[in-house]
């Protein structure tokens, strides 16, 4: 990973992300991962009404004030490279509050997945964190 990146920032180092953004650096992280209940809210994601969704995107937007874009790579049908999709800066984000921001971001992620759903990493346990008292979706 380091070969093509300037640096790696630990996902728990929010101030490192904010500092890099305020210095004009581009940062990337995966908001579609389940990072656990701490630092997450529950928002709809496809047909799952309560998917743990990171507050990291919301926090970075509020603290750094940097524009957000999406970047998706879709494997070419000839398997010789990728098509890269880079969005315009997202408008209307973060909206009002963490849950609204998470729902907005999940809709964006859904849109990107639907470009080529067969290429999404469905095997990762995106829904492992559940609201207290709710049963696992993997049993």
What are these model-derived regions, one by one?
Residues 11-139:
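Non-catalytic C-terminal accessory region of glycerolipid acyltransferases
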Residues 1-12:
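Membrane-interfacial amphipathic helices and adjacent loop/beta segments
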